[in-house]
């Protein structure tokens, strides 16, 4: 059996990051983690474009337009949707997740779902690097690996 693995090298990659304006204290940490991961793995800051979305619900459309532009090898979507007392959370979190997945599947451009969906602000802060790991960095690493793996798939 042939085992095909990708490397975590971003030297020649061009990424877009989309982040939400809501919960910016949390999201800013995710963006910092994403940028740091990209640069630490050989990417150049000038090959990383950052787009600010009004909210998580708008992210899929922005991701779709960026993917269709042909300018990016991958897109990293970052945000924080924190559960409240209404059903609004379910619609926003579900809509963002489905839209981001559909963008990736329909365009063939890898798009990471780095939107935190948590019950509390504390949980979101922990996932943004306060206690353990930074989901922005993790989403970026997943995209670096995915792009490099896709490049190894033979074209027919």
From Swiss-Prot:
- Tell me the residue numbers annotated for binding (2S)-2-hydroxy-3-oxobutyl phosphate: 85-86, 127
User: Per its record, what are the GO molecular function terms?
Assistant: 6,7-dimethyl-8-ribityllumazine synthase activity
| Catalysis performed (reactions) | (2S)-2-hydroxy-3-oxobutyl phosphate + 5-amino-6-(D-ribitylamino)uracil = 6,7-dimethyl-8-(1-D-ribityl)lumazine + phosphate + 2 H2O + H(+)
Q: In which pathway does it act?
A: Cofactor biosynthesis; riboflavin biosynthesis; riboflavin from 2-hydroxy-3-oxobutyl phosphate and 5-amino-6-(D-ribitylamino)uracil: step 1/2
Q: What is its EC number?
A: 2.5.1.78
Q: Does the record carry Ribonucleoprotein as a key word?
A: no
This protein is called 6,7-dimethyl-8-ribityllumazine synthase
Give the record's family classification: Belongs to the DMRL synthase family.
* Source species: Deinococcus deserti (strain DSM 17065 / CIP 109153 / LMG 22923 / VCD115)
Positions binding 5-amino-6-(D-ribitylamino)uracil in this chain are 22, 56-58, 80-82, 113
Q: Name one GO cellular component term.
A: cytosol
Q: Which keywords accompany this UniProt record?
A: Riboflavin biosynthesis, Transferase
Q: Which GO terms describe its biological process?
A: riboflavin biosynthetic process
Functional note: Catalyzes the formation of 6,7-dimethyl-8-ribityllumazine by condensation of 5-amino-6-(D-ribitylamino)uracil with 3,4-dihydroxy-2-butanone 4-phosphate. This is the penultimate step in the biosynthesis of riboflavin.
PANTHER family reported for this sequence = 6,7-DIMETHYL-8-RIBITYLLUMAZINE SYNTHASE (PTHR21058:SF0), 6,7-DIMETHYL-8-RIBITYLLUMAZINE SYNTHASE DMRL SYNTHASE LUMAZINE SYNTHASE (PTHR21058)
The record's active-site residues are 88 (proton donor)
- Keyword Transferase applies: yes
